[in-house]
Amino acid sequence: MVELRRITMAEPTQALFQAPVCDVCGKDAVVEQAYSGRVLCGTHLEQSIRKKVGRELRKQLVLDKSKGTTIFVAISGGKDSAVLLTLIVDLVGKRRDVRIVAGCVDEGIEGYRPPSMQCAIDLCEDLGVEFITTSYESLEFHQMDEVVRRLPMVSEKSAGASTMPCSYCGVFRRQGINALAEQVNADVMALGHNLDDMAQTVLMNMANGDIDRTLRLAPHTDSPVDGLPPRIVPLRWIPEQEIHLLAMHKQLPMHHEECPYAQ
């Protein structure tokens, strides 16, 4: 006969699941890097990302000590630009020959842009960074809410016209970012494109057979496009998941909602 006995709470029991711990310090881990095999806690994930971004800044960012350098950082209130601005301030913000300005474009999307704009403002206040903004109306474009309302009429008048809001918003937003960079006489523009963004863009261009567009991808350190300030992408080798984890670890102000018109 098999003997059964009751296990009380006072008796030690073997854990059914062992939470992963950091390879470096033994604390609770937040990520396993599939590409490196490392398991890291929030603190050592931050150190890993900081090291990679610092290496990219040394490659992409050319600082002119004689006249100083103005870096314009395009932010949106989201995780990518929040991490980008935080790391740029951390890595080069103390230099006397560097001026950092952050800017955000208001697309005119009710219920989405106001809270994300506030996150951008809060982040800049926390970091002590100058903040500027512009809107589609200031650029003499329609607000995106109005653009979306008119899309059915546009498609009726022109069969070849795009009915995707992102097609219009992308063009307007790029012009807004360029206008902000020009406003502060920026020497360089920093964009928050991560590894996932870069890979997606390359694959889409390959699928469309658009090799020229792939060749024009940032960074443009040595060959600025259309006379604009060089564009740098310090986060281009950082996976989106790690950026999100770092933003949460540092409790950065960020807006989690997706654009209601995203497709």
Residue ranges and their predicted role:
Residues 2-216, 220, 240-242, 249:
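ATP-dependent adenylation/nucleotidyltransferase module used to activate substrates
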Residues 217-255:
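Metal-dependent de-N-acetylase/amidase catalytic core
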Residues 247, 261-263:
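RNase H-like two-metal-ion nuclease catalytic core shared by retroviral integrases
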